[in-house]
Amino acid sequence: MADKMQALGAQLTQALQETDEFKALKAAFATMKEDDATYKLFKRFQQIQMDLQQKQMAGQQVTDDEMSRARDVADQVAKIEAVKTLMDAERGVNALLNQLNQTITQPIQDIYAG
């Protein structure tokens, strides 16, 4: 049974890559990456987010300075058109994945609703 699930997962991976949403995300990322300054700022933003998340997960308090720095970088990133396009594309893929997750988990929801 696990092999069947793995095979279905591989098929879903392929199907996802063929969707317009995924293609838009891939193109938006490539466009954003072409501008070196934008890409570096985007990577910095990702790193700051990851650092803050890890700190919170470890039960550590995020300082006001860290939050201020994160907001500053987020504000800079949000003003860049290529990043806005990337974020829109991410929302499209996330919506698709949320729909898929609902479909997959419906039998589990049915068990608890029953």
Curated annotation (Swiss-Prot):
Recorded coiled-coil stretches: none
One Pfam family here: Com_YlbF
Membrane spanning stretches: none
Signal peptide region: none
Disulfide bond positions: none
InterPro entries found in the cross-reference section: Com_YlbF, YheA/YmcA-like_dom_sf
Family membership noted in the UniProt record: Belongs to the UPF0342 family.
HAMAP family: UPF0342 (MF_01526)
Protein name: UPF0342 protein LVIS_1488
